[in-house]
Design a protein with these regions (language model features):
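Terminal, compositionally biased segments used for targeting/anchoring and flexible tails
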Residues: 4-150
Length: 150
């Protein structure tokens, strides 16, 4: 078992979505009006991310993004830090040839994870009922037209 852990590469497809979820959680819980100590701690956290990524190349790429798009000007407010986090996520997606996602869609996807499973199941059932209803209406209408023209 230990051998497999040492040999197996940690696939970004597995850990990266969780990583981005945690980063967005950190940004969304950032103080509205942070003081200098808080700004410094968050600055340090963001600048330590490249060291914490399990794939060295991705860590180096993230470090380059931090050089190109520094976080410092965006640590003055929660809003700007959230937008910077989203912007950086899109920059990483660009570099990986993944589609960019607009800000509000990203927030919707984030908050979807907090939706209780019972509500998700109810929403799915309601959607299926609507699809079934529309299908029945279309079939009935088609049958009426067919019989009328006959």
């Amino acid at each position: 078992f230990l051998y497999h852990l040492l040999v197996m590469a940690l696939a970004p497809e597995v850990w990266a979505p969780h990583y981005w979820f945690v980063l967005m959680t950190i940004a969304l819980s950032y103080p509205l009006n942070p003081n200098d100590v808080t700004k410094k701690k968050y600055y340090d956290l963001i600048h330590n991310i490249p060291l914490l990524l399990p794939v060295e190349k991705l860590g180096n790429d993230f470090s380059n993004l931090l050089d190109e798009y520094p976080v410092t000007p965006y640590l003055d407010s929660r809003d700007s830090f959230i937008k910077w986090t989203h912007f950086i996520h899109n920059k990483v997606n660009q570099s990986l040839d993944k589609p960019e996602i607009d800000f509000y869609t990203a927030l919707d996807k984030y908050y979807f994870h907090y939706k209780p499973k019972e509500i998700i199941n109810q929403d799915n059932i309601r959607f299926r009922e609507k699809v079934l209803f529309v299908a029945i209406i279309l079939l009935t209408s088609g049958l009426i037209v067919y019989l009328y023209k006959k």
